[in-house]
């Protein structure tokens, strides 16, 4: 009780111009709620696509520019939001290496084959007698230590190098590849793959003007929906390739210097890749897997 009386007396004796700590705190909160407008704030670019899938509370969507292929100067036509769990993951280069090596080897079959001493023609007769000649004993001229003989412990093809990585590792490899491409400014998003002409020279000059490098991979949602102009323009170029979104892989992304995605492709990749983060283990045979697959 005495402490309350003393505090009230101090507040009553405080000069009129002094403000208490509570008043300063209230003013600070009010100033934080009303930010000052920027003096040089220009017109904001339109956001052409919002991130529709839920984003974790501790993360924010990544914004990227949307470009157009219809002209040299139409480099930025708006913004798009990218999901951080797909385009801003941890750069696990070890997983990227595992997926790249697996993709090269899981279809590999080695047909190398050598003949053993039983398969080489000849050598059925003993070259000389066992004793008395002074030379080393031999039973066949097709022994592995003879010239023209069989091979010991040689390859016996065809040999399959097939093995399967877990699905989680393969999905993470795609996420890491997309993240690295975006971080290195080698990932570009366009509104569509429409070109004003079918001339391959226009596509090469456009890539040179925007500094895309010598090899570019264009990804659209479906192969049937790709514009005819870009199909005709890339048909005569070896380093400019088209691929549907369902066929996008780590090897193709690492092989090309620049990756170009359309807006529907971005939505498709986010939906497919994020589904694996919350998928359940099937309790029924694998012939009917994952009925909730998007």
Swiss-Prot record:
<keyword id="KW-0687">Ribonucleoprotein</keyword>
<dbReference type="InterPro" id="IPR002136">
    <property type="entry name" value="Ribosomal_uL4"/>
</dbReference>
<protein>
    <recommendedName>
        <fullName>Large ribosomal subunit protein uL4m</fullName>
    </recommendedName>
</protein>
<feature type="modified residue" description="Omega-N-methylarginine">
    <location>
        <position position="147"/>
    </location>
</feature>
<feature type="region of interest" description="Disordered">
    <location>
        <begin position="120"/>
        <end position="139"/>
    </location>
</feature>
<dbReference type="GO" id="GO:0006412">
    <property type="term" value="P:translation"/>
</dbReference>
<keyword id="KW-0488">Methylation</keyword>
<keyword id="KW-0496">Mitochondrion</keyword>
<comment type="similarity">
    <text>Belongs to the universal ribosomal protein uL4 family.</text>
</comment>
<dbReference type="GO" id="GO:0003735">
    <property type="term" value="F:structural constituent of ribosome"/>
</dbReference>
<dbReference type="InterPro" id="IPR023574">
    <property type="entry name" value="Ribosomal_uL4_dom_sf"/>
</dbReference>
<dbReference type="Pfam" id="PF00573">
    <property type="entry name" value="Ribosomal_L4"/>
</dbReference>
<comment type="subunit">
    <text>Component of the mitochondrial ribosome large subunit (39S) which comprises a 16S rRNA and about 50 distinct proteins. Interacts with MIEF1 upstream open reading frame protein.</text>
</comment>
<dbReference type="GO" id="GO:0005762">
    <property type="term" value="C:mitochondrial large ribosomal subunit"/>
</dbReference>
<dbReference type="GO" id="GO:0005743">
    <property type="term" value="C:mitochondrial inner membrane"/>
</dbReference>
<keyword id="KW-0689">Ribosomal protein</keyword>
<dbReference type="InterPro" id="IPR013005">
    <property type="entry name" value="Ribosomal_uL4-like"/>
</dbReference>
């Amino acid at each position: 009780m005495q402490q309350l009386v003393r505090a009230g007396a101090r507040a009553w004796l405080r000069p009129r111009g002094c403000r208490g700590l509570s008043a300063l705190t209230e003013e600070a909160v009010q100033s934080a709620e009303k930010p000052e407008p920027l003096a040089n704030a220009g017109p904001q670019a339109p956001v052409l696509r919002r991130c529709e899938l839920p984003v974790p509370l501790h993360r924010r969507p990544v914004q990227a520019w949307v470009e157009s292929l219809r002209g040299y100067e139409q480099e930025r036509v708006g913004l798009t939001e990218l999901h951080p769990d797909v385009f801003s993951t941890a750069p696990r280069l070890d997983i990227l290496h595992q997926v790249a090596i697996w993709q090269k080897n899981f279809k590999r079959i080695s047909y190398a084959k050598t003949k053993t001493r039983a398969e080489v023609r000849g050598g059925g007769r003993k070259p000389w007698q066992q004793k008395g000649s002074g030379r080393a004993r031999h039973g066949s001229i097709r022994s592995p230590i003879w010239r023209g003989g069989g091979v010991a412990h040689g390859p016996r093809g065809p040999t399959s190098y097939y093995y399967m990585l877990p699905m989680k590792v393969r999905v993470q490899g795609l996420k890491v590849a997309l993240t690295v491409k975006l971080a290195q400014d080698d990932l570009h998003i366009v509104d569509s793959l429409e070109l004003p002409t079918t001339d391959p020279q226009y596509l090469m000059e456009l890539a040179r003007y925007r500094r895309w490098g010598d090899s570019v991979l264009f990804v659209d949602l479906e192969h049937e929906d790709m514009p005819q102009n870009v199909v005709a323009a890339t048909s005569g170029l070896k380093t400019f390739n088209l691929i549907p979104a369902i066929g996008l892989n780590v090897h193709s992304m690492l092989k090309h210097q620049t990756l170009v995605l359309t807006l529907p492709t971005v939505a498709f990749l986010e939906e497919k890749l994020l589904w694996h983060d919350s998928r359940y283990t099937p309790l029924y045979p694998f012939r009917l897997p994952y009925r909730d697959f998007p």
